Amino acid sequence: VLKPSEHSSNTTNILQKIIEKSFERGHVDIVSGGPEIGQKLLELNWDYIFFTGSTEIGKIVASSAAKTLTPVTLELGGNNPCVVDKDVSIKLACKRIIFGKFINCGQTCIAPNFIAVNKKVKQEFLKKLVNELNKTFGKNSHESPYYSRIINKKHVERLSKLIKGYKLIYGGNFNLENNFFEPTVLEVSSIKDNILKDEIFGPILPILSYDTTEELTEILNEYENPLAFYVFSNNISFAESLISNNSFGGGAINDTIGQIVNKKLPFGGVGNSGIGKYHGYESFKTFSHFKPYIIKSNYFDLSFKYKLSEDSLLFKFTRKFLRYISI
């Protein structure tokens, strides 16, 4: 049974057509509706529950599943960092960050949520970021055939409130009538700012800067267990040290969102960003119950296994052997 979001009716219609063409009636079903339908579904006893959504709702799903000991996979959100080192190919980094951030208008769970850029390259980075945005979407992104729209008016309003009071480097325009929200880049002075408290899930890219490794560590430690983690650096030792010392679901060095392309790589979160993993063979394993068993021969039987005397040679040998291998 699939329960898509009530906000994505067009996607639901496409899924319905695919299912009707691919499966016999009754094998796979789609259930439409709002949160009340989702709550009713959670009251049923399932073999497995797979949920994609916010951490807040993920906790509700996990709590409901626990009542019947139903296993779950939770693919949740995350405040995904993107670190830009001083030793970096800036133009290429900008192009790849723009692709990963603004695809589907920033409405992906693995989009970079903010940039932490080294102060030594900050101004050059911002200049080239703006240039690449203009090249990608044109100076009027409203007319670009490559730029998406926000899912609904409610979220356009939410995003418009997020950017109030910030110094805008690029964008900031929106249109409630057609759910347009311009690609937006803004400066953030503190890791405690409201815009960085939660996953943005939209085309807004806050820019933080750091000077020392200690400052960068302080920034990264502020956000627990993101779903994705990105580092742009020509210094692979520096990049790998960040990868090793931070907990996250999956990530990339010198790229964004590329980690989901390889079907052999498992995808999933950790801690607040999710439980379990899937993609490729991992998806098959996720939705399968591995049931081990043996078939015992009836042609011979070892009688001593039923009653092993402490005086027997086999018992003495076994005890000495176990002591030997435990040394």
Task: Indicate where each model-derived feature is located.
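ALDH superfamily catalytic-core signature
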Residues: 23, 48, 56-191, 253, ...
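Short, well-ordered alpha-helical microsegments
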Residues: 38, 58-59, 239
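A structured beta-alpha segment of the ubiquitous adenosine-cofactor-binding alpha/beta core
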Residues: 29-47
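Short, surface-exposed connector motifs at secondary-structure boundaries
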Residues: 1, 22, 42-48, 221-226
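Conserved C-terminal structural/oligomerization subdomain of aldehyde/semialdehyde dehydrogenase
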Residues: 83, 180-327
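Conserved small-residue-rich beta-alpha loop and adjacent elements
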Residues: 1-23, 69, 91
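Short beta->alpha connector loops at strand-helix junctions that form conserved
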Residues: 3-5, 32, 52-53, 85-86
